[in-house]
Amino acid sequence: MDLLLLEKTLIGLFIAIIIATIVSKLRSKRFKLPPGPIPVPVFGNWLQVGDDLNHRNLTEYAKKFGDLFLLRMGQRNLVVVSSPDLAKEVLHTQGVEFGSRTRNVVFDIFTGKGQDMVFTVYGEHWRKMRRIMTVPFFTNKVVQQYRGGWEYEVESVVEDVKKMKESNTNGIVLRKRLQLMMYNNMFRIMFDRRFESEDDPLFVKLKALNGERSRLAQSFEYNYGDFIPILRPFLRGYLKICKEVKEKRLKLFKDYFVDERKKLANTKSMDSNALKCAIDHILEAQQKGEINEDNVLYIVENINVAAIETTLWSIEWGIAELVNHPHIQKKLRDEIDTVLGPGVQVTEPDTHKLPYLQAVIKETLRLRMAIPLLVPHMNLHEAKLGGYDIPAESKILVNAWWLANNPAHWKNPEEFRPERFFEEEKHVEANGNDFRYLPFGVGRRSCPGIILALPILGITLGRLVQNFELLPPPGQSKIDTTEKGGQFSLHILKHSTIVLKPRSF
């Protein structure tokens, strides 16, 4: 950084400290704010808390300051909710007041400042985008239309694994093949397209760009520049990379998928009774003037991030827990063999006949919640919560992982025990009927992808367990389940090698 920029930064910092001190004193007299660590001017609690706002760190603060606490991170107020009653207030009772999404410098780049559905503010644009996306993505009709494709994709995984010599000896990193499966599951829905192999050049390019987007957006590295505007010049290089990745991704979506589908529609007569893929519905909305081309591309962006990777994380966590708990794996396999018959492959309708499979999925989503803080909420205007004043445009984090892992609400929560959903938690479902358990959120801004994720999880875990014995690699009794948290993600740190021994029927 040159001396002139450094001088300007220091002068700005000095002025900001004076202004922040005055504003802080005025605001403290006016508001009854939630408890939290004592902030300092300009930096707030950032010097104490740091950039790593993962679910476990926030849980420790909840133990110290209570179920509702405030972190002042530079210019941003972060309000953290850690009880079922307060979660109900934010997500349901005051769902409109807290129904918006926060903005940050990186997500503004990747979403075109909220031109998508997931990260836009609550209002007319969100309602329009949700309506346009529901029919092609989030209905039971979609599940029935594409379940055969999902079953084919996991069957292909099983057959490919059986052909890999290493799979039943030293083991393989199964995630690589499952990633191809998940891309095919979602690209069938979006574009009626699939990739033939992991070596497909277009798949390799797409996967690399999506991976870089996830890394940049989920990293805690940029928090300091987002929280404290005076430090934002230090983020110039980071934000430049974000813009480059965004432009490359949107160009790839447009050139290879959206425009290709348009050409197909223009060159061959489309049967009006034929089943449409999602992009057909979305392009119709564009033709009617309901959305523009940028909105179309940001819808594709959302699905690439929100639908593919999150479900893949949950599949990977489920496999890891089954490897590390062989008695649970055996119990699940026995259920499938008993209910369906040995060798009869699990289909989507079968998953509803397999209660232990459903319990394994629920327990995976409880202990290893893919989005442990949900997607952050925001109140556009001043609000009340738990008897406290919440300043306008506060970032509201619901620590859904702690709701589902708090020993005050769950019996031995650190234990992976699917049986709890037959016993003391038999009435708890993943759809948000109990505010202790919100893997997909609940209310207006809940994740509509639940309708796709649950059947895909069921088919995938069911087929793998019935066709293979899943084991740690030679010399290990368990695989490593160390967590890697992100801005609001939770996935496994190391993509483990596992041994898959084929079963004979």
From Swiss-Prot:
Catalytic activity: (E)-cinnamate + reduced [NADPH--hemoprotein reductase] + O2 = (E)-4-coumarate + oxidized [NADPH--hemoprotein reductase] + H2O + H(+)
One Pfam assignment: p450
Organism domain of life: Eukaryota
Compartment(s) where it occurs, according to its Swiss-Prot or TrEMBL record: Nucleus
Sorted UniProt keywords: Heme, Iron, Metal-binding, Monooxygenase, Nucleus, Oxidoreductase
GO terms under cellular component: nucleus
Official protein name in the record: Trans-cinnamate 4-monooxygenase C4H2
Residues that bind heme: C447
Molecular function terms from GO: heme binding; iron ion binding; trans-cinnamate 4-monooxygenase activity
Motif (Nuclear localization signal 1): 161-168
Annotated metabolic or biological route of this protein: Phenylpropanoid metabolism; trans-4-coumarate biosynthesis; trans-4-coumarate from trans-cinnamate: step 1/1
Lineage: Eukaryota, Viridiplantae, Streptophyta, Embryophyta, Tracheophyta
EC number: 1.14.14.91
Induction remarks: Repressed by MYB4.
Statement: the UniProt record of this protein carries the keyword Lipid metabolism: no
One Gene Ontology term from the biological process aspect of the record: lignin metabolic process
Organism from which the protein derives: Petunia hybrida (Petunia)
Intervals of motif Nuclear localization signal 2: 247-254
Role: Component of the floral volatile benzenoid/phenylpropanoid (FVBP) biosynthetic pathway that controls carbon flux to pigments essential for pollination or UV protection, to numerous pytoalexins synthesized by plants when challenged by pathogens, and to lignins.
Primary enzyme class: oxidoreductase
Cofactor(s) needed by this chain: heme
Family: Belongs to the cytochrome P450 family.
